[in-house]
């Protein structure tokens, strides 16, 4: 797919939705007109024939309205449910056919063929879904680690450092990026950015292999930081900010650092834009990508964000006195209710970060090349999420979910279902619904360790996202039982003991630690997918591991099967 295809597809979607809305509005207007004429006629009949004919007249009107409503409901169902499902099925069929043609071609001896940017047929229909029922989720175990070549390069000197991975996977392909620091792990001085894209293919042993088809090394003197990546049709989109000062200094600034969007297509087209989203200047002191991956949703690319909001601004005032306390806290915290509320309210404000309000949200950008003022910043309401932090967005079918790093006082994995409201064809508001869980804890310092259960001010933790294996919406009460997998650091206060796990709301079901006790580690990213040929579910756990040989950290992808026992 070439770069120009994306705007055409977006335009077609807009035309279809606009036509549908116009048709529905026309139908509504006709219905009102018919109803009005019917009422006038009925009034005339009643004045001439008395009340004897009223019942039959009302009955005919009721039948007429029922017929109109039935037609309207069928149109709404077809446009909102049936047609998208048919399009999704058609897309999968076309992708499978294209991949089949590409892999079956026998090439002439002197010809070359560039592999199509499409995953193997076995995986196309097994990506970005919930893979198990609620009952099956209770009986899952981790399979052994599988040996595959790493698609992630490491540092090549003892002084080098690779950090902050971001990975995105869709039906067609995957995108990956990380920061490369030449000396030490402080990314605010000078760093480069590694980017790659590729596909999933099966090995002769039957398990998947991540094949790299394109790489890009951004080494141009621009210090891009905390980049989030998302797959888009035909390539990758990456969101970074540019800064050459420590994180704390960013929060004390009067204006946010430079924001950049980079679009890299498989046909070697590269577009980079400095963006200026409306409502950011004079409101946000700093605005940062969430480092976790974004998603492509209804023609828009969504990225997780967080940053510091300036006191007295409209956003600050709108969030005043808002707070969120996860459902599980009531049974686990010994503080009285008033103390919990007071501490929860104050947890969003940091004197260490210049008394800014630490806020989470979503950056939404349309998929087109002229993005200077097109991207939008959508903040979460703080009565639905905790203090702002790094994060990740997921697509499960047609639903968007959000992971928020547990920087604040609640140490458990924070996952939310996100609802996005569109106005005039563009996203205008977001809301979040938390998946209640008292697992899996992250390490933290002081009173904010993995054992803490009560509200208070914290600025700690580590990024450790998780993949939902079951659908939280499948239960009568949202999220009352959910199973997920990921990696965490199995200690109360230190970044050590990386452990891969499967857990539900209340307990860890299966786990396996990597390396010896005391192995240092940091960020962890998890993504799962299904081989529809063997019906096996695989998960890739991307973990930052400390190294005594090459660099302070190496980023390692581990792959293993999740099995139903």
From Swiss-Prot:
Please give the biological process terms from Gene Ontology that the record holds.
symbiont entry into host cell; viral budding from plasma membrane; virion attachment to host cell
- In this entry, the parts of the chain located on the Virion surface side of the membrane are 41-565
Disulfide bridge positions per record: 161-185, 175-236, 227-240, 333-454, 365-375, 448-458, 528-539
* Region spans: Involved in neuraminidase activity: 223-228
Q: Where are the transmembrane segments?
A: 20-40
Does the record bear tRNA-binding in its keywords? no
Q: Where in the cell is it found?
A: Virion membrane; Host cell membrane
What does the record give as the reaction this protein catalyses? Answer: Hydrolysis of alpha-(2->3)-, alpha-(2->6)-, alpha-(2->8)- glycosidic linkages of terminal sialic acid residues in oligosaccharides, glycoproteins, glycolipids, colominic acid and synthetic substrates
**GO function terms (MF aspect):** exo-alpha-sialidase activity; host cell surface receptor binding; identical protein binding
Glycosylated position list: 139, 267, 504
Give the membrane topology, semicolon-separated if more than one. Single-pass type II membrane protein
Its Enzyme Commission number(s) read: 3.2.1.18
Please name the Gene3D superfamilies in this protein's record.
1.20.5.110, 2.120.10.10
Entry keyword set? Disulfide bond, Glycoprotein, Hemagglutinin, Host cell membrane, Host membrane, Host-virus interaction, Hydrolase, Membrane, Signal-anchor, Transmembrane, Transmembrane helix, Viral attachment to host cell, Viral envelope protein, Virion, Virus entry into host cell
Intravirion-side stretches of the chain, per the record, are 1-19
User: Which InterPro entries does the annotation name?
Assistant: Hemagglutn-neuramid, Hemagglutn/HN, Sialidase_sf
* Primary location recorded for the protein, binned into one broad class: virion
> What does UniProt give as GO cellular component?
host cell plasma membrane; membrane; viral envelope; virion membrane
Q: Which family does it belong to?
A: Belongs to the paramyxoviruses hemagglutinin-neuraminidase family.
Q: How does it assemble?
A: Homotetramer; composed of disulfide-linked homodimers. Interacts with F protein trimer.
Domain description: The C-terminus (head domain) is involved in binding the cellular receptor.
**Job of this protein:** Attaches the virus to sialic acid-containing cell receptors and thereby initiating infection. Binding of HN protein to the receptor induces a conformational change that allows the F protein to trigger virion/cell membranes fusion. Neuraminidase activity ensures the efficient spread of the virus by dissociating the mature virions from the neuraminic acid containing glycoproteins.
- Stated name of the protein: Hemagglutinin-neuraminidase
